[in-house]
């Protein structure tokens, strides 16, 4: 068992003392840090936000925002479709630093398709196709999300459609995990188009719109569509699950037994992505092998299969199934690709078990050897206990039950109180570094354990000017200093 306790050093009392149960009063968000007000006005429009935020009375203030039910009631009374005042159909919702490169036209799904569907024949990873926005990192996470319907339904809320007889009012809602809260985000269904086609994320089925509206809701969460250009897949996977991400550098610090890590993570329903670093001189450069530099991919399956060569030699091969969020024919063309002769070494029954399909759909298989040779980063999002319970699974590792718990603490840097500055002020005057919020880790009993540390920061004056900045500090730094704080009773 591991215990985490917040510590606070007062400038007036330079000795470190543990806080009691009233510690949240020190770290609570006040009017000087208008986080709750900002969330409430822009995103906190669902009952989930009101329930999970014990520190925010403003989430319950209906004068600050409308709930989904309020929006539906207003639309029914007026007979008009909803138009989101917080994320309007204007250029500023698309770009914050420049004007749109084209004359985009905002259209509702009924103006794009004669028979629009929210989800048609179930959501799948093939519903996720990238448009004219560099957010492959987001699409890789969305494609992974579709692998687990129970988790998907927590983000893409069910019972939404375009049927006027079933409360269709032009409003759709999604849920995202941000700063220890499930935030419900409502958007209207006006989508940017050019020449009658969706500009950004879309489904392979032109009549299906759940993925396009999900991207719009996430763009609203981040401030604009442009804010989605370039990002971290692990961040979006955490936003979809409330889980904790782990990032592996395959170039400078490749982990031992990566295949085992990937296979166990897949068995535990973790979300997995991989990526190739960008060429600074070329945007998303396609390589001769069919892979794309500066691009993120979904890992959709991890298998170890039996093979037999034409000469009768037998063995095992480790295979990774990868999906390009672009869809289409831009796929890996090396060993174990769609047209590779290696597949003749696997029995027909084994191929059926693998769900093997040879199509120009953006999905392909690679050997572990080629995966390590070409991919440069792997990001794994381990589900939190709530999401894990949703998929009805337990951690089984070598016949030993594994379980884990999550503890979260909210803190703020307040001038004159908890803003102690960087490590430069640890030993030199005014020696204020200890005033920063601290958390002591205590190993309450003997035995092995794994401790993952994830720190996110909210900045109302983020670089994009739209109020959200989420940073995952280096876990390596945390691990290197962890020994200073571990103690046993």
Named regions from a protein language model:
Residues 1-489:
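Structured alpha-helical subdomains that flank or immediately precede key functional sites
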